[in-house]
Amino acid sequence: MIEREKLDKVKHRFQEVESLMADPEVANDPDRMRELGQEHSRLEEVVEAIDRYERLLDERDELEGMIRDESGEMEALAKEELEQLETKLPAVEEDLKQKLIPKDPEEEKNAIVEIRAGAGGDEASLFAGDLFRLYTQYAKQQGWTYELIDASPGTQGGFREVIFAVKGEDVYGTLKYEAGVHRVQRVPETESSGRIHTSAATVAVLPEAEEVDVDINPSDLTIETFKATGPGGQSVNTTDSAVRIKHAPSGVEVSCQDEKSQHKNRSKAMRVLRSRVYEKKREEQQAEREEARRSMVGSGDRSAKIRTYNFPQDRVTDHRLEGGQKNHSLQPIMDGEIDPIIDALRAEEHAEKLANL
């Protein structure tokens, strides 16, 4: 059952927003009015769901009182009505829970995914390649599209680094759970003694920023061109088609050499740069909020290592989950079937947000 105190807070805020919107001083501030209008629209839907939920709770109390106080036909009728009400209540409560959690507008955005080989040399690059395949398979299963932005191949295959964009419905809101350190344990093909090696790759997932999301002044950019290179550093192009862009205020630097056209490389590099600058600003704002929250409730941070792929034991372990949701069969995950993990993490996040309302 949802605490009445939490519901009262939401209703109080709704009344507060309505009062503010009626204030002539606020009405003369278009930005403030737009902001309040959006909040009012969201809260109105929540308050309607609260009213439905509270009506059912009041009806339940009334019926339970009748069952205690009445007998015979009236008692039987009250029991029958209570039974019907109890079947309706869980769905109404779940609907309210979902509406109580503020929707993050970032979740609907497309995403930029960056995979980098970590510790483990060639084996880490091969694993980065496996993760790239995992996510592109998952994208196909979801009906999304993806576009390679930049890649640095590993010397034995895979990637030292690969950056790609994913487009579709709720892409960032789904893939954000994949950000972190992914660890692999397996016997490399080059290992004659059969020893298990541990290596790692990092995954960064950024909401793809639109031009309206972040203001980048062209005078803050330093743009360089150079010849594209392949594995091992050899030049693969006779023209300066590769592009490197640096944003002075943030220190963010992006290079792209995937396309033969300098213009296309520049366009792709700007997409990544815009998203990284946007994400940096979001992280700074989030860090300020988290610092304030930590000072009140203490840190609940998890380890950066989010998942281990254990090939000899045919097992994938997500270290953020517990119980039966923690371990999964390896091959389906490597083939992109990661919905069970993402669904469990999303449910946990929703429960945590609800607890912190």
Curated annotation (Swiss-Prot):
Transmembrane parts of this sequence: none
Give the Basic residues compositional bias ranges.
Answer: 263-274
Q: List the disulfide bonds.
A: none
UniProt GO MF annotations: translation release factor activity, codon specific
SUPFAM superfamilies in alphabetical order: Release factor (SSF75620)
Q: Which residues carry this modification: N5-methylglutamine?
A: 234
| PANTHER family tied to this protein | LD18447P
> What is the recorded name of this protein?
Peptide chain release factor 1
- Organism for this UniProt entry: Salinibacter ruber (strain DSM 13855 / M31)
